[in-house]
Amino acid sequence: MVRRKKSKQACSKGLNQRLKEDRISQFYESLLCQILNYLPTKDVVKTSVLSTRWRSLWLLVPSLELDSRDFSDFNTFVSFCDRYFDSNRVLCINKLKLTISENEEDGFYLKSWIDAAAKRKIQHLDVQFLPQFHKIHFNLYKCEALVSLRLFEVSLDKGRIFSFPCMKTMHLEDNVYPNEATFKELISCCPVLEDLTVIIYGMDRKVFQVHSQSLKRFSLKRVSSFLHEVALSGVVIDAPLLCSLRINDNVSKSFIVNNLGSNDKLDLSILFGLWHFDETSVTSMRSSIDRFLPGILSVMEMTIHSPAFMLMYRYLALIPLPHLPKFSYMSRLSVTLGVSDLQFLPTFLESCPNLKSLIMESNSNSKRMLLNGNYHINFSSVPKCLLSSLEFVDIKSSILVYVARMKLVKYFLENSTTLKKLTLRLALRLQYCSAKDEIVKKLRKFPRISKTCQVGIVFD
């Protein structure tokens, strides 16, 4: 009797212990789904073996991320997805990411999956094809609840009419569009679109047009390694609410940008399809640059990369000083350049009469010039902004050899009448060596035309 009583007590104690250990299973279903939503899908599915309570719980998780490479073979992946999207237990799909690494010509499976997701009011869709461009015919036009869309290496169907009344974010990377109208329609059918990223396959020869009354941020990348073999069409951007524009394009020969305002930010790396920047080459593209510049002259902040800087300098050098186009609203300029480009900086700054802040960084040619000892620079003029508006100069001197660096610092200290602070950023390794002391001594000897100017050295 005593032994039986002890046995019951032991069983009761073990049961209580298990209940304590599995308190998470006592949570409300909605809370469990929220917890599972933070886990990778393959781990979420594994919870189905924990107990009867957990067997179908993963089907209620509103986010799904599936990669065909996580399955033993592609047929197993398709079979799993078919069962999932056909399940009556799946009531809501908020977010779906599909990564597919097989080249199935018809893509029959994807159409039914997207249809199923559309019926469940999917809001975030990400489809990636890894091996190559994939020709599919899935019904994007049915996904009217979409808020964000990402397509990677997808070949879109011809003649579809899209409607995305809720779409705010779109990322289109290396996709194939059957014609120019399809791309244009895809963008213009999003009346509340705010963020757009477009990465274009370098050899695509279409004119890409972005017309949007709601777009606020746009990033475009169109790059090819075979510049000498291409002669591609251009880009048209018309977005009156745009406040941030980033263009990295070495292929397009024509750019038209409308409606950039005085509060906008511009990140520019464009070559107008040129391989060389001699006077003859730049002159050949002058009409295209003439059409492009008026659309960006009102920007407040600009980042310009080399060799786009050299292209713009060569263009500006063709124009008499009184007729030089002016970035009158620009207050902040960040420029990437090499030692050989420094002598052209004053000419470029002539176009920025109200500039307040200037940041300079290096390009990959600077180290090569250091090894060659080729760093002769000569500043021939003092632009207006140095005499009336420039307040902050930040020189990231990994860009420069010692002589060039000190010439640049001396130039700004001697000529910037309104300068408040000049920051010289040095490599961290110089912090504890004698070169640092030599630089400090030099800086103290340089005359400063601005009595309020402070010089700071930062090691990073």
From Swiss-Prot:
What Pfam families does this protein's entry cite?
A: F-box, FBD, LRR_At5g56370
Q: Which InterPro entries match?
A: F-box-like_dom_sf, F-box_AtFBL13-like, F-box_dom, FBD, FBL13/AtMIF1-like, LRR_FXL15/At3g58940/PEG3-like
Q: Which residues form the F-box domain?
A: 21-67
FBD domain span? 375-426
Q: Tell me the classification of the organism that encodes this protein.
A: Eukaryota, Viridiplantae, Streptophyta, Embryophyta, Tracheophyta
What's the protein called, per UniProt? Answer: Putative FBD-associated F-box protein At5g53640
User: Which CDD domains does the record match to this protein?
Assistant: F-box_AtFBL13-like
| Gene3D superfamilies in alphabetical order | 1.20.1280.50
